[in-house]
């Protein structure tokens, strides 16, 4: 057994990458460790291409084992179940920087698996998964362009922190995951608390410096134990078929791909493709559908890129930095929906519905790694097939929908008010009505407006915009020229080189995600894209503010909530024996009450009257009975020597028979009965805390007040 390892001294804790000890039958396998968090990452690629394979079948799996945190899995079977949202997001985060590093046309089935073996609760395994996936490919015999490194950047007290621990992240204003090569960026994602663009760019530069260290260490590992690269074949368009394709479509493809609408464009492109297919199969009957598809896609992509680079011409006729027509509208649904909004950008449209609920509706998550295990703001993204004029599977969420929802959620979350200011659980559901690029950014805009329409006091509105990229490269795959595109449509995403999504307020950045089809771009290009996005975001915010600029009144159908605080050591008094007191308050007011361990009491009611009554009853329970004050309450029992009244919830006082009325009272029941509501004055509290009340004294005070008001003096 030959074991080799390298140590990357970056961030809070060094990252160790080791190979040769575990999973030695995989094409590549490494164990990555930071602190006491350990992951195993493997890669295996098939040696033959499956018949009919038309794309690069790269699958990335990430699994958190309960044993890694010294825990038992929940559920009846006590086994890990289907992937959690966090696992799916980590899969996507690991996949995106790897995919561009394989050669174009490499269609061999390839699988990367990351297993969390140990979790110390402080060092997040997602960064280890990305670094491990790259290292496993680097030491394997797979055709992998060059090492990819990844770091997380936080910003605490104005200082950038590399790979902050979970404890440090709680105080960070930035959560940036950066993946790249030694000198180029491939992928970023994360969130920030309205970070100015200049500071955001500074964070990217710091990340690039540290990623370089990790990439160099992977190269060291490859030098001592890397396998010789395997032989493989690439599935590319055949020259003889390309010649036929250009003969048929070369002069007509531009007219087809630059039709004004998506539907018309699809019709023209489809008709031209059929002509190309017929011509190819007539001359080469052995040609497959895939051969035809490769030829036609090559011609389309080439025409698209030439038009952008040489003519500054976009498919829908816009200038390179021009937005599509914008539409913003709130309250598009009846007020039974707490808040609704619709945002459209060209042929992309999102309808968002905001719902408010008691805090007990917040989402709780199984968490083995020590990161967030609950959240009160949730955004769900739904992409039905009709949004692209298609049929297909409906219901349930795929990885793409989960990823888009997470991006929109973390982009809006920084402006959502805290629990103390707005004690609600909040859910936004984004329903994509039409899709032609950047539906996640439309979800951010519509989601923001729906929250304002629901009365949520956001710090500031958030808007999102996408920036695309088209490049020209030399034989060494170096970028020689490029054009950035604002607000890209679907075809520009498909045929372009970049989809960079940036969200923020008028004050700064809140969320971002970069996806590339290239094996990296210089930071300077990304910095330019950030400034382009900022200008576009400003224009989008203007349109949104015209629709709604401030929180509206809450819907009458939204729950009413009040929060109060009681001493933590007196929670039992509010609950009462067997829940007697709290049940009585809820029954009388119609409200729901939730008590936290620190004594915070959340009161929820459908109507304001019930909320006010419940708050009054809770407040009264923790008031101190004072001598000389008047109190109104029910008679709870009678005796031969008097009656007991409920002075405050859970606190009774005795009205002696002599204090029930003026003159002599023969029998208590002659004056009061159980259930009567009376007003009495506290006339004393003995050393044992027993309260003495008097109806007679209350009546005397009332008569004296009436006489004084009438100007009568004795």
Curated annotation (Swiss-Prot):
One GO CC term on file: cytosol
Ranges for domain S1 motif: 628-696
EC number: 2.7.7.8
Biological-process GO terms, alphabetical: mRNA catabolic process; RNA processing
Start and end residues of each KH domain: 559-618
Top-level taxon: Bacteria
A molecular function GO annotation: 3'-5'-RNA exonuclease activity
Gene3D superfamilies: GHMP Kinase, N-terminal domain (3.30.230.70), K Homology domain, type 1 (3.30.1370.10), Nucleic acid-binding proteins (2.40.50.140)
Catalytic reactions on record: RNA(n+1) + phosphate = RNA(n) + a ribonucleoside 5'-diphosphate
The keyword Ribosomal protein appears for this protein: no
Cofactor entry: Mg(2+)
Main subcellular location: cytoplasm
Ligand binding (Mg(2+)): 493, 499
Compartments in which it is found: Cytoplasm
Keywords: Cytoplasm, Magnesium, Metal-binding, Nucleotidyltransferase, RNA-binding, Transferase
Similarity-based family: Belongs to the polyribonucleotide nucleotidyltransferase family.
Protein function: Involved in mRNA degradation. Catalyzes the phosphorolysis of single-stranded polyribonucleotides processively in the 3'- to 5'-direction.
NCBIfam families attached to this UniProt entry: polynuc_phos, PRK11824.1
Protein name (database record): Polyribonucleotide nucleotidyltransferase
Species this protein is from: Akkermansia muciniphila (strain ATCC BAA-835 / DSM 22959 / JCM 33894 / BCRC 81048 / CCUG 64013 / CIP 107961 / Muc)
